[in-house]
């Protein structure tokens, strides 16, 4: 029953959000294409997706900066695109 409830919540979030473009379930960065990383799902760290690297103004994680990362990424955010850095902006970190 718990699994069913989690699936329902996930489907509702996907249906009513403007979330990230998900390009496929993977395990590590090396399995993703250029310009993407294998980020953990915001709902479960056991599920990872290939998502685009951060662009200017997008949220980022300051410790997540290496692509490809050889291990399993724990953050749901990818590093910034080439030429951008992840820096603190107010209370968040953003690519700039």
From Swiss-Prot:
One of its GO terms (cellular component) is extracellular region. Gene3D superfamilies: Lipase, subunit A. It comes from the Eukaryota. Residues 1-19 form the signal peptide. It is found in: Secreted. Pfam families: Prokineticin. GO terms for biological process: endothelial cell proliferation. Expressed by the skin glands. Disulfide bonds join 32-50, 37-78, 60-86, 80-95. The keyword Signal applies. PANTHER family: DICKKOPF-RELATED PROTEIN 3-LIKE, PROKINETICIN. Belongs to the AVIT (prokineticin) family. This is Prokineticin Bm8-b. It comes from Bombina maxima (Giant fire-bellied toad).
